[in-house]
């Protein structure tokens, strides 16, 4: 027994020198727990001790967490001595006289305390430290039988948090002497047995702590560490890694730490100081060199760890890869590889044709039967594996099965390309079906419910169809499922935007109708309050248009399942579009022509009608001139109101957005995805020179105002002249007394007509007919008929006169003959009548 160095930090409980009879670690039989300082957890015959938990429970100073440390190295390098000095354990050490094997199997002890040089008040973690002493390698007792030392090293690596690799300084740089060959085997098997667990727990690592003994100081520790690190990385690169963990690096599994110890005999005090310095690294949590990192722990309680350790040993003990491959296995590997290569070669020829069939099927308009396609995949794969079984099943079973699995993976990998063709086609056709469903307006329930139902049903149908051709899950469907779900979400998102834009369009239409009515009413009689009324109406209609979507918190929810950010963008778009609509309506109702018509209407209302709406009849020019001036002033009162949008307080109407900014117009043209909006923002905008662009409130430019004023003045002056001319005509007409003179001088003629019954009756008939036509509003048509008859008679008379006066003898004779013929006919008629 070696004496325990002091000082030590003793964990709560008994002192290190508890009164138990020591049991030599060279003993090869399990003994009762209550008399042990250490327990042999695996004996030299590879038997696992099931009393570990009882021992740990009896020896632990307190309940709580624990740390597992093991030591690994060549025989007789002082592993047990190091543990005893460092962790105050009582492992049996080598008899230096006989130099024979001391530790057999694997032993464990609970550390009573850690040797250190920390201050008395330094923080000491409360964990129990469990120390495993592993049988040394390269011992003469076992000779060339390396099976146990490989398994023991792998067990220590798999169950420990910190694996202390104990070696002499002179062993650094050696391959066998530094146990690099053994480490290579252990690393390789560790990958095959426990590598997959690394994929599920990416943070877990094991610390390889290299303790270099008898360090003279000539070679710096950094150089020794670099040599060991290079050797380990070279070994790792040469490992035969399983395919699923081949991408993982050495750093993903292990951390490295190094510590040197002076010669125990020649520099004993220095040796003890170095041990205490190493102990500090296990205790001082505030130090950067603290060795117990959280990701080294197995994250299971001690009861679970003992079960885990037993299962690890069982798996390690029954794994044949730790033995050198036999000739039978070598032959099996060669033959199975040969058969597998032949089978795969035949399959590769067929798979090329299968790919062509897949391309043709996806390009055809006929629907694909995915069930039959999947059965075809299975039959083809099964046929290849049956051919392999026929030629390879007679060899070593484990090799045959391993190579069969490899062949199946290669088949799956080849069929994956064909599967991808069908899967991409399925994605496309399924999305088209969903798109058609989205475009249909007949939906039951809310939009969100309808979309959720459509998404679930389409995703279910897609997954079912994809599963039919996935060889019962052997082919990787995840990329296509992920792509389909992403595209499906994108389709739904686009439909949400369509619905959102539809809501905004309806709201803008409602706003347009309300504002149009308001404009008509206000422009019928403009006043100083016109723009106050229009702006008030605009704000009221804008708020009420989306009022039903407003939440109690003051936000807006359009009930489409859109994100709050999208709702805010929609609100901003509506805000901009509403101001743009107001601007468009202003310029629709207040253009140059419309303004001129409004001024003319206002002038006519005042000029042609009085206050009661009765048409005016001007008697003299003085009255006309006064009314004209008043009417013109009344009309022009609306001119400044309708050329500048100004409120009653004198301020101009200023919009919330610059509705004439082209960039803003494109940005708020419609509600879009945030990504699309950002991409468009990054585009270069075509800009024009907007320096001469007038303000929102300036409805007409100065040139347009001048043009309207000129036209208005010209047309009003024309009306004035026309009206004045009618007055002048009225003044210059025949005096009324002339009619009295005519009546007096023509009295006899009037009386003659009245006394003659024929003329009187004719006069009565003409007066009656005139009255009837007047009452039936037929005087106009009658006058037109009379006028046309007069025109026809006049035209006929002119033609006859022209024929008569033509200076042509033949024509004159012909005309005379016609006239004679007519006379004869008249003579005949007269004769007959007589």
From Swiss-Prot:
<keyword id="KW-0342">GTP-binding</keyword>
<keyword id="KW-0812">Transmembrane</keyword>
<keyword id="KW-0547">Nucleotide-binding</keyword>
<feature type="region of interest" description="Disordered">
    <location>
        <begin position="1"/>
        <end position="26"/>
    </location>
</feature>
<dbReference type="GO" id="GO:0032541">
    <property type="term" value="C:cortical endoplasmic reticulum"/>
</dbReference>
<feature type="region of interest" description="Disordered">
    <location>
        <begin position="670"/>
        <end position="689"/>
    </location>
</feature>
<comment type="similarity">
    <text>Belongs to the TRAFAC class dynamin-like GTPase superfamily. GB1/RHD3 GTPase family. RHD3 subfamily.</text>
</comment>
<dbReference type="GO" id="GO:0005789">
    <property type="term" value="C:endoplasmic reticulum membrane"/>
</dbReference>
<keyword id="KW-0256">Endoplasmic reticulum</keyword>
<dbReference type="GO" id="GO:0005525">
    <property type="term" value="F:GTP binding"/>
</dbReference>
<feature type="transmembrane region" description="Helical">
    <location>
        <begin position="758"/>
        <end position="778"/>
    </location>
</feature>
<dbReference type="GO" id="GO:0016320">
    <property type="term" value="P:endoplasmic reticulum membrane fusion"/>
</dbReference>
<dbReference type="Pfam" id="PF05879">
    <property type="entry name" value="RHD3_GTPase"/>
</dbReference>
<keyword id="KW-0175">Coiled coil</keyword>
<dbReference type="InterPro" id="IPR046758">
    <property type="entry name" value="Sey1/RHD3-like_3HB"/>
</dbReference>
<keyword id="KW-1133">Transmembrane helix</keyword>
<feature type="compositionally biased region" description="Acidic residues">
    <location>
        <begin position="676"/>
        <end position="689"/>
    </location>
</feature>
<feature type="topological domain" description="Lumenal">
    <location>
        <begin position="755"/>
        <end position="757"/>
    </location>
</feature>
<comment type="function">
    <text>Cooperates with the reticulon proteins and tubule-shaping DP1 family proteins to generate and maintain the structure of the tubular endoplasmic reticulum network. Has GTPase activity, which is required for its function in ER organization.</text>
</comment>
<feature type="transmembrane region" description="Helical">
    <location>
        <begin position="734"/>
        <end position="754"/>
    </location>
</feature>
<feature type="binding site">
    <location>
        <begin position="73"/>
        <end position="80"/>
    </location>
    <ligand>
        <name>GTP</name>
    </ligand>
</feature>
<keyword id="KW-0378">Hydrolase</keyword>
<dbReference type="GO" id="GO:0003924">
    <property type="term" value="F:GTPase activity"/>
</dbReference>
<dbReference type="InterPro" id="IPR008803">
    <property type="entry name" value="RHD3/Sey1"/>
</dbReference>
<feature type="topological domain" description="Cytoplasmic">
    <location>
        <begin position="779"/>
        <end position="834"/>
    </location>
</feature>
<dbReference type="GO" id="GO:0048309">
    <property type="term" value="P:endoplasmic reticulum inheritance"/>
</dbReference>
<keyword id="KW-0472">Membrane</keyword>
<dbReference type="Pfam" id="PF20428">
    <property type="entry name" value="Sey1_3HB"/>
</dbReference>
<feature type="domain" description="GB1/RHD3-type G">
    <location>
        <begin position="63"/>
        <end position="296"/>
    </location>
</feature>
<dbReference type="InterPro" id="IPR027417">
    <property type="entry name" value="P-loop_NTPase"/>
</dbReference>
<dbReference type="InterPro" id="IPR030386">
    <property type="entry name" value="G_GB1_RHD3_dom"/>
</dbReference>
<feature type="coiled-coil region">
    <location>
        <begin position="659"/>
        <end position="688"/>
    </location>
</feature>
<feature type="topological domain" description="Cytoplasmic">
    <location>
        <begin position="1"/>
        <end position="733"/>
    </location>
</feature>
<protein>
    <recommendedName>
        <fullName>Protein SEY1</fullName>
        <ecNumber>3.6.5.-</ecNumber>
    </recommendedName>
</protein>
